[in-house]
Design a protein with these regions (language model features):
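Generic protein-terminus/edge-of-domain signal
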Residues: 1-56, 71
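A hydrophobic/aromatic-rich effector-binding and dimerization subdomain
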Residues: 1-16, 59-126, 140-148
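Aromatic-acidic/polar surface patches that form glycan- and anion
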Residues: 25, 69, 128-131
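Glycine-centered loop/turn positions within well-structured domains
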Residues: 40, 65, 173
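Hydrophobic packing within well-folded, soluble alpha/beta domains
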Residues: 51-54, 59, 167, 180
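Short, Lys/Arg-enriched, Trp-marked, Pro/Gly-tolerant hinge/linker segments that flank
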Residues: 98-108, 122-135, 140-184
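Short coil turns linking two alpha-helices in DNA-binding domains
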Residues: 187-188
């Protein structure tokens, strides 16, 4: 498994693009996905979630995820990357928790979320307080509408997955075999 670490934690970044296969990646941003055409598969930890047009999903900071596209035809989505510091009242919870099921189906997506996603894709270079307000609206719905679980519950107990996750989370540090073995609960 090829893992990518992306530095996406400064302000806001938005992309409206064709969906493609994306290998497992990890970044410090809150990632929001809103499917505008077709379908996409969102993989979070060991789970794969099917998304269709109008579905909304969120991936919290430092959670390994990937994308796959199986549908033929036009598949497009809005991808928003928000710096966690934009939402100080949610910052601590964003570090500890993750949605158990990261998708809200089209028929249940609150209009506030849709309006905020559409506003954010057009507001990248304007007033940061307005950007912050839209981010707060989205997270307020996420934390009230989605069941949260401890981030440690996302993923797998598989030793390979755990090793990749450890390296991804500690790649900026010098990695020692004995420290990694201790963290993974295996002998050196």
């Amino acid at each position: 498994m090829l893992l990518t670490y992306e530095k996406k934690n400064e302000g806001i970044s938005a992309e409206w693009k064709k969906t493609v296969h994306v290998p497992p990646l990890l970044h410090e941003a809150i990632e929001i996905i809103y499917v505008t055409d077709g379908t996409v598969e969102l993989g979070v930890g060991q789970e794969l979630f099917h998304m269709e047009e109008g579905d909304f999903a969120i991936v919290f900071p430092n959670v390994i995820h990937h994308y796959q596209v199986f549908g033929s035809g036009k598949n497009k989505a809005i991808y928003l990357f928000l710096e966690p510091a934009l939402t100080p009242s949610f910052y601590e919870d964003l570090q500890k928790y993750s949605p158990k099921y990261p998708i809200i189906r089209r028929e249940k997506v609150p209009m506030d979320i849709i309006n905020s996603v559409k506003a954010l894709i057009n507001l990248q270079d304007t007033n940061s307080m307005i950007i912050q307000a839209h981010a707060q609206i989205i997270l307020a719905h996420v934390f009230s509408d989605m069941e949260m679980v401890d981030k440690d519950a996302i993923g797998s107990d598989d030793i390979i997955y755990c090793a990749v996750e450890y390296v991804a989370k500690h790649f900026r540090e010098e990695i020692f075999r004995y420290k990694m073995a201790y963290h993974l609960g295996v002998s050196n």
